[in-house]
From Swiss-Prot:
Any one GO molecular function term: monooxygenase activity
Family: Belongs to the Rieske iron-sulfur protein family.
Biological role: Iron-sulfur subunit of the cytochrome bc1 complex, an essential component of the respiratory electron transport chain required for ATP synthesis. The bc1 complex catalyzes the oxidation of menaquinol and the reduction of cytochrome c in the respiratory chain. The bc1 complex operates through a Q-cycle mechanism that couples electron transfer to generation of the proton gradient that drives ATP synthesis.
Keywords: 2Fe-2S, Cell membrane, Disulfide bond, Electron transport, Iron, Iron-sulfur, Membrane, Metal-binding, Oxidoreductase, Respiratory chain, Transmembrane, Transmembrane helix, Transport
Required cofactor names: [2Fe-2S] cluster
Localization terms from the record: Cell membrane
Subunit structure: The cytochrome bc1 complex is composed of a cytochrome b (QcrB), the Rieske iron-sulfur protein (QcrA) and a diheme cytochrome c (QcrC) subunit. The bc1 complex forms a supercomplex with cytochrome c oxidase (cytochrome aa3).
UniProt keyword Transcription, yes or no: no
Stretches assigned to the Rieske domain: 291-388
Binding site for [2Fe-2S] cluster: 331, 333, 350, 353
Membrane topology: Multi-pass membrane protein
Protein name as annotated: Cytochrome bc1 complex Rieske iron-sulfur subunit
Database matches in Gene3D superfamilies: Rieske [2Fe-2S] iron-sulphur domain
Length: 406
């Protein structure tokens, strides 16, 4: 019961009250007085009411259509990357803009429809609330339901079946435009794709895994070149035709005590030396190799005096070629690039978290948070004198993960 003597009602008295009286009582108990309320359309069937309903319905309809369009674009429109000159490029260029346009319009039109509904249909009302302290009254349990019912009745949404349905559908679809993109974040990390220059999409593979499929992989040096500029009668344009981002390496290309970052270069994508073809365009495929998350390898040429001190890992005694050793450039801590090499100490350093690996001791960690040695890539020289991979890594590259046994 209420602690306010003036608001101390029995259950029988509350049962005798109408919904309107209970609603008014509820506002009074909350210290709120409805000073003014005016129906927008007091006369049933008022043409102005129908015009207002149509306006709101149009905006809800736009929201529904836009939300459906968003789902159609997201689910069915081609989203795979298309490069310059490839079929379907013009469709691909519209994919992201259409997602933004349809999702934005769906949410915006739903909001505009709600605003119009409030401004044009819900009764005009002025309420005054008084400040008061203390806990809520027990009687509030009875009046809150009446207040909600009163709000529903005064909104007139209950008898506007079409608008009610459109608002519900629009709200659900607008919500889907927010929830649906989250599906793109759900990925099975062990779902294998087609094995390519970047692996098959799982943590077990890299571009070097192609060696297991019989693909000859050269150790490719990054030249850093980009598309070449051409001047023609129609203007200036850039082309990658005849441009080689990765080229093959010979042992003599690397000085003693030096390090070079190399990437897998399949024989079919070679375009240098005696295999150079000015009309070939392998630039994009070579860039895919450079961008492979587990492809980067450090090729180190030790001094002859240091090479005699090397401690080989059991089972990997023949992974090197003379003074040349190839270690994964992906730190075994959390996958940062181990991009520094101290020629005097023969240590490989990860600048991110200061892990250090001994190049003379099969890439074993000697300092920092890394707990495992850098995987070593077996290398050799082919009949033409170029450095090639003699096999794949015998362990996963990069940091630890749950399924890894070591």
């Amino acid at each position: 019961m209420s602690n306010n003597p003036e608001m101390n009602y029995t259950s029988k008295e509350l049962d005798a009250m109408s919904n309107e009286e209970l609603a008014r009582l509820g506002t009074e108990l909350d210290g709120v007085t409805v000073a003014y309320r005016k129906e927008r359309f007091p006369v049933e069937g008022d043409p102005a009411s129908k015009r207002a309903s149509r306006t709101v319905g149009i905006w809800f309809g736009i929201g529904i259509v836009s939300a459906l369009a968003f789902l159609a674009v997201y689910l069915f429109m081609p989203w795979e990357y298309k490069g310059l000159g490839e079929d379907g490029l013009w469709i691909y260029t519209f994919y992201t803009p259409l997602l933004g346009l349809t999702s934005g319009l769906a949410i915006l039109s739903l909001g505009i429809g709600v605003i119009f509904y409030i401004k044009k249909i819900i009764p005009s009302e002025i309420s005054v609330q008084r400040r008061h302290d203390g806990p809520s009254e027990e009687i509030d349990r009875r009046t809150i339901t009446a207040l909600l019912n009163d709000s529903w009745e005064t909104s007139t949404l209950g008898r506007r079946k079409v608008l009610k349905s459109m608002l519900g559908i629009g709200g659900v679809l607008a919500g889907l435009t927010i929830i649906a993109p989250l599906g793109g974040m759900v990925k099975n990390p062990w779902k294998k794709g087609e094995l390519g220059i970047q692996g098959d999409g799982t943590l077990w593979t890299s571009g070097w895994t192609l060696h297991e499929k019989g693909v000859k992989l050269y150790l490719g040096r990054d030249t850093g070149v980009t598309a070449e500029k051409h001047e023609t009668s129609v203007g200036t344009h850039y082309s990658t035709q005849g441009v080689s981002r990765l080229i093959r390496m010979r042992p003599e290309d690397l000085a003693a005590a030096a390090m070079e970052t190399v990437f897998p270069l399949p024989a079919e994508f070679v375009n240098d030396g005696d295999k150079y073809d000015a009309s070939a365009d392998v630039y994009e495929e070579q860039m895919h190799s450079i961008h492979g998350p587990r492809n980067a390898v450090m090729l180190i040429r030790l001094r002859n005096s240091d090479a005699n001190k090397v401690i080989e890992r059991e089972g990997q005694e023949d992974f090197h070629y003379g003074d040349y050793y190839a270690y994964s450039k992906i730190c075994t801590h959390i996958g940062c690039p181990t991009s520094l090499y101290e020629a005097q100490t023969n240590r490989i350093l990860c600048p991110c978290h200061q892990s250090q690996f001994d190049a003379l001791h099969y890439g074993k960690p000697v300092f920092g948070p890394a707990a495992r040695a850098l995987p070593q890539l077996p290398i050799t020289v082919d009949e033409e004198g170029y450095l090639v991979a003699a096999g794949n890594f015998i362990e996963p590259v990069g940091p630890a993960f749950w399924e890894r046994r070591s």
